[in-house]
């Protein structure tokens, strides 16, 4: 390869990445997932469009694995362990039982549609059986879903790859050797994948955390150390036959949930790297496919995709979540709909090609077609479906910017910046009148171009910029303090006419609003009553019906319900209440 060829590759690669970024601005306007647009750029530049011929499956496999490792590391860093209280076991059930059911149901129909053997059909089912972390993390961000739904989908997508990889590799081995039966040794291999992946991911994450916190480096080197460490854990786990995908996700989880040096620098760097990984991966996969090869299989492939989306996935979710009573029907329906397929099925479809199996190209084309249908149909309808099934909650007000204050190695202090508009509650109030969360301080106040020294008598005006020092756990309280007036209206429409304290006694609530207890202990706190009726760990947005009224969890403090909204039938708004 001469210098001219190398330079041409640099130019083409840079143009494709730049084109993907620029065209992605159409995503929000058209309502099309950004991943579909990037995939389309690759297809347009490929053999049937721009004429770029790319058929190196080994390179695609390399790029795909590298990209997924970075994406899962970033996803783990941003997942809060606190969300595990409501979603760990349901998500693991979906990641194992759910994938198995989807594989079997999809595989049987694939065998019938394409006149294949049962094992070949099951291989197709295994290839497309898992949801994709890149697609889920990308499309769920900023949608305002309740914690139970978001955590279930994110943990499932981060942990279901071992099952899909295990089934795919096992079925490829059976086809290559002519086997037709299953044996108990396969279960041990699956346990090995999960066990080794979990052990090395958690252990390696802890070791990497100690390195980051104990070694003094230039600030820009910490993110690189984290990425290098994550990739090393991914590769080592794969080398000893564990699940590298699970390991790198758990590594990120450990790093993201412990005090770590240069947290914001690491998160900002990983955010950019995750975007680059997604762009590179979907560009390569778009270049790899030959669009005209998809036309002959379009009708049966569409039928298979719709079967998986409308039948196989919902049934797998129904069975997988059967033991978990806290999930409402609308939450199960939404989780069933967001069975997003992305890069993982296409990468798994490369396995049969590299193994030289008959019909390998058919498997690849089918996987690509199903991913395309999934992203277009499920991805584009996600916001609409979330509203239809009522799984969204009013978003918490957020500062316009936030930055870390590295006052010591594992400092968790941050600087939050709020801009005060005319609709803010605190306009006209003196600073001494504000009930700030304990441990927070207003460090500076900007008015126009002028920096003011804030004192207790300083009166807030429209357009002021407030710089507040605090911790991440102070954000909800600060958000309420500096929230906009329209937010209060939204809260009341969602949570109800009044908001009560969670520790209010049922007897007092019943007397206040004229409700019947019907044998219920009057001394029971309202929060405990809701937990009993809900039959599971509560999250903001959970609702129960009692005495013809709707009671909604409005504010959580860790595992405890702090405030509860009550909504009365139209025309019946008795008694006083507390506004949120």
Curated annotation (Swiss-Prot):
PROSITE patterns, alphabetized: RCK_C
Pfam families per UniProt: CorC_HlyC (PF03471), Na_H_Exchanger (PF00999), TrkA_C (PF02080)
Reaction(s) catalysed (UniProt annotation): K(+)(in) + H(+)(out) = K(+)(out) + H(+)(in)
Membrane topology designation: Multi-pass membrane protein
One GO cellular component term noted in the UniProt record for this chain: plasma membrane
Protein name from the UniProt record: K(+)/H(+) antiporter NhaP2
InterPro entries per the UniProt record, alphabetical: Cation/H_exchanger_TM (IPR006153), FAD-bd_PCMH-like_sf (IPR036318), FAD-bd_PCMH_sub2 (IPR016169), Na+/solute_symporter_sf (IPR038770), NhaP2 (IPR023729), RCK_C (IPR006037), RCK_C_sf (IPR036721), Transptr-assoc_dom (IPR005170)
Domain RCK C-terminal: 402-484
GO BP: any one term: cell volume homeostasis
TM stretches of this protein: 6-26, 34-54, 57-77, 86-106, 108-128, 162-182, 189-209, 217-237, 240-260, 279-299, 302-322, 334-354, 366-386
Encoding gene, per UniProt annotation: nhaP2
Any one GO molecular function term: potassium:proton antiporter activity
Keywords, in A-Z order: Antiport, Cell inner membrane, Cell membrane, Ion transport, Membrane, Potassium, Potassium transport, Transmembrane, Transmembrane helix, Transport
Organism: Pseudomonas syringae pv. tomato (strain ATCC BAA-871 / DC3000)
Function: K(+)/H(+) antiporter that extrudes potassium in exchange for external protons and maintains the internal concentration of potassium under toxic levels.
Subcellular location: Cell inner membrane
Organism taxonomic ancestry: Bacteria, Pseudomonadati, Pseudomonadota, Gammaproteobacteria, Pseudomonadales
Membership in a protein family: Belongs to the monovalent cation:proton antiporter 1 (CPA1) transporter (TC 2.A.36) family. NhaP2 subfamily.
